[in-house]
Amino acid sequence: MSADPRHYDVIVAPVITEKATNLSELNKVVFRVAPKATKPQIKEAVERLFEVKVKSVNTLITKGKTKMFRGQRGQRSDVKKAIVTLEEGQTIDVTTGL
């Protein structure tokens, strides 16, 4: 399996937080993904880029916060995340990068 350049557009970055680290013990990895990416696209991108077998993909959209900037109210962008469950025995080390 080879990675297609469009797969790099689907996966934006890994999420490295305390919650994401706790999920890694359950064989799950969290990524920030493109807002228009679908579950099948995310599954294919992870399988091709990291050469692992994906069991399932769950997605969520975190709404952007309202912030003040120079007295004006602004809105941060929404962020889409994907929680990717890997098959047994499969691992991804997200700290090394692509």
Swiss-Prot record:
Gene3D superfamilies the record matches: 3.30.70.330
GO CC field: ribonucleoprotein complex; ribosome
GO biological process: translation
Pfam family, one: Ribosomal_L23
UniProt-recorded Gene Ontology molecular function terms: rRNA binding; structural constituent of ribosome
UniProt keyword annotations, A-Z: Ribonucleoprotein, Ribosomal protein, RNA-binding, rRNA-binding
UniProt xrefs under SUPFAM superfamilies: Ribosomal proteins S24e, L23 and L15e
Family per similarity comment: Belongs to the universal ribosomal protein uL23 family.
PANTHER family named in the record: 60S RIBOSOMAL PROTEIN L23A (PTHR11620)
Assembly behavior: Part of the 50S ribosomal subunit. Contacts protein L29, and trigger factor when it is bound to the ribosome.
Function of the protein: One of the early assembly proteins it binds 23S rRNA. One of the proteins that surrounds the polypeptide exit tunnel on the outside of the ribosome. Forms the main docking site for trigger factor binding to the ribosome.
UniProt protein name: Large ribosomal subunit protein uL23
UniProt source species: Methylobacterium sp. (strain 4-46)
